[in-house]
Amino acid sequence: MLIDDTTMADASSELYEPVNQYKPVARNIGIVDGPFEYLTTAGVRLPLPFTTRMTVVRLGNGELFIHSPIAFDAALAKRLGAMGTVRHLVSPNQFHYAHIGEWSRAFPDAVTWASPRARKRAHSRGIDVRFDRDIGVEPPEEWRTEIDQIAVPGGIFGEMVFFHKESKTLILADTIINLELDKIRQPWRFAAKLTGMYYPRGQIFFGMRLPLFLQKRKTRAAVQKMLSWQPERIILSHGRWFDSNASETLQRTFGWAL
């Protein structure tokens, strides 16, 4: 069975609401917008809410690849279970892993994938999550024919970027942020305007900029690889995703590295 692609998610009207509902993006790939999360420092929750989003890819064998799982929701889990076998729970960077434990307890046969540094960070923060495998430079056998990947440098914010070949969709977590100013409150709104991380152009996450610049050669190689895939759209974890002109967006955002 293929994921239904008759009612596609609209990047403008369905970006946030409804939450915890699967929204097809293209054949065999969709998104789920999640509830607000809050930044925490030293165990203290800061009044800085941000939106969340996970991406779901249905592989040819019926298994589901879930990128950056949002907070667990039983009804959503049931819906996904009906679409395919929840098999791969993927952490794209060391900050997008917190809910993998919840999903793995609901789907104990799923394989949990750790991005670089995710194991250490989870342990240091006392997060209850079991990681089965580590994500390497090359895509593993489990999805290499359908999903490609590349490591994007960024210091502690570095992440694994994925590409769904069938739909020509680039899947990002934090590398690019594209916040809609009318959907966020202060001080996020001020920060977004100050750093350029807002719709319609978006921008590289500010925490990655200096590390990317200092590793310009690796950055160039990663961007050239992404451009070689000729992506048509870019799904982001935070803010409005780009439903068209993906290559142009990459060239505009990373032009300084090319």
What is each model feature region?
Residues 54-58, 159-164:
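Short beta-strand scaffold segments in enzyme catalytic cores
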Residues 31-34, 66-68, 148-151, 170-173:
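Active-site-proximal beta-strand elements of phosphoester/diester hydrolases
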Residues 77-141:
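Active-site HxH/HxHxD metal-binding segment of metal-dependent hydrolases
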Residues 153-154, 160-201:
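Conserved, surface-exposed functional patches that form binding/active-site neighborhoods
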Residues 24, 116-159, 165, 214, ...:
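Metallo-beta-lactamase
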Residues 39, 47, 71, 83, ...:
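Cap/insert and terminal regions of metallo-dependent hydrolase folds
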Residues 2-60:
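Zn-dependent metallo-beta-lactamase
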Residues 67-68, 87-93, 113-115, 171-174, ...:
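Active-site neighborhood of phospho(di)ester-bond hydrolases with catalytic His/Asp-centered motifs
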